[in-house]
Amino acid sequence: MLAADFGNLQRDCEMVDNSQADWLHIDVMDGVFVPNISFGMPVIKSIKKNSKKILDVHLMIVEPDRYISKFKEIGSDILTVHVEACNHLHRTIHAIKAEKMKAGVALNPHTSVSSIYDVLCDLDLVCLMSVNPGFGGQSFIENTYTKVEELKKLRDKTNSNFLIEIDGGVNLDNAPKLLSCGADVLVAGSFVFKSDNPSKTISDLKSL
């Protein structure tokens, strides 16, 4: 939803809610971990109240542990934290699960997938950033394909069940290859909301 029209957020949320999209992906930015500032809890609570979709909340913030219970209270279904922001990742993952949410971990483009090897079996989702986090509308980083393949091999090796999510620069040109490499979830922001017919664009992605 970062690429939505914030002046018409209800309209854009309703469009997604009535589309073939499976989830609503919400980027929470604090201006510290990433340069930008985005949605706060009151906005997310309002979105959840008026949406039937799974709420996939991506925390691009420092000290995410401080807010885990609050994000449960406002309706988050999936809560993803950055490995780069967590001093005690294993503890953070289990704190999320203790609140009955799905637990995800995000990796910045420069972060190796091997950095989360020891927690893979605890995860419901791994989000690979395919752009540098903090701003929408960036170009896709080509090395992401290799990281998806590496992560899929690790998933098979460890008999883990997490979903592989790709966030950033996703479009109809790179989506087929991402899926063939092993991606399960594609986050499309600018490609959807900047298109002439966002609902059809979502349908086109879902048809792949």
Segments and roles (model prediction):
Residues 84-86, 108-110, 131-135, 190-193:
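Short, acidic/turn-prone active-site loops that include or flank metal/cofactor-
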Residues 166-169, 187-191:
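Glycine-rich beta-strand-to-loop/alpha-helix junction loops that act as flexible
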Residues 169-181:
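Acidic, divalent-metal-coordinating active-site segment for phosphoryl/phosphodiester hydrolysis
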Residues 76-84, 179-188:
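Short, electropositive alpha-helical surface patch
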Residues 7, 106-110, 168:
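Short gly/ser/thr-rich secondary-structure transition/capping motifs
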Residues 25, 165-166:
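Generic enzyme active-site microenvironment
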Residues 1-80, 85-88, 95-98, 102-103, ...:
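Conserved N-terminal beta1-alpha1 strand-loop-helix module at the mouth
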